[in-house]
Amino acid sequence: MRRKIMIILAGTMFLTAAVAQVSAQSVLMNSAETINQGNLKLGIFPTILFGKNGGDSVWGVAARFGYGLTKSIDIEAKAAFFKGLKYFGADVEYWFLKGENFNASAALGGHITDYKGGGDSKGIDVALMASTRPVKNLELYGGLMLAFDSIKNGGNYTLAHIVPGIEYRVSDDLDFLAEVGIALNDNSSSYGSVGLAYYFLR
């Protein structure tokens, strides 16, 4: 129990420190399989938001810190930081289809977004994911990621992405992930993300 508490505190300190270091676009960065029951995961993902209409691309960092509640349900805190933008949220994922070589899950959550200069928003996140394992240690996944945002003292908008990605098991407790988020509407920006996820108790 003490070890779990220390790990949770370490994850919280990481997310707090990241605010000071990087000034977010949510990322998927996981297959349809949930975190093993009782395990903890910390993922750090450098992310680029691709510029639109000739605009500059912007680098930032996204992070996820999660816990496996049951054999089919996990919960994750998520954060992302870009210049002038901070994003904090959480979601619950349910692994509803467990096939021999095909899995599917759905996630529901919420977030707040802090924009420098105004325009802060909050919203609901929905994601549907599917994955398969073509070879040992490698998973291919794809997802539909939606965010329904409401701007403080303003209007509403929706972010929508189709997200193909890969998850490669480097070792028993470390995964490498990479994905591209393809924007589906004018409100969204396409992105690329790559990084590592560490499982403390796998």
Identify the function of each model-found stretch.
Residues 59-62, 86-89, 124-125, 161:
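Short, surface-exposed coil-to-beta transition loops
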Residues 1-2, 39, 76, 177:
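Generic N-terminal leader/processing signal
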Residues 86-90, 187-190:
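A short, polar/proline- and glycine-enriched secondary-structure boundary/capping micro-motif
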Residues 1-34:
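Cleavable N-terminal export/targeting peptides
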